[in-house]
């Protein structure tokens, strides 16, 4: 998996 996906998921979790 590309780091972009991981970073996106991390950002979403951070918002919540």
Curated annotation (Swiss-Prot):
Q: What is its main location?
A: secreted
Gene Ontology CC terms: extracellular region
Task: Give the superkingdom in one word.
Answer: Eukaryota
Q: Which UniProt keywords apply?
A: Amidation, Amphibian defense peptide, Antibiotic, Antimicrobial, Immunity, Innate immunity, Secreted
Which residues are recorded with the post-translational modification Phenylalanine amide?
16
Q: Where in the cell is it found?
A: Secreted
What Gene Ontology terms for biological process does this UniProt record contain? Answer: defense response to bacterium; innate immune response
Q: State the tissue distribution.
A: Expressed by the skin glands.
Family note: Belongs to the frog skin active peptide (FSAP) family. Temporin subfamily.
What is the role of the protein in this entry?
Antimicrobial peptide.
Question: What is this protein identified as?
Answer: Temporin-1Ts
What organism is this sequence from? Answer: Rana temporaria
| Lineage, top ranks | Eukaryota, Metazoa, Chordata, Craniata, Vertebrata
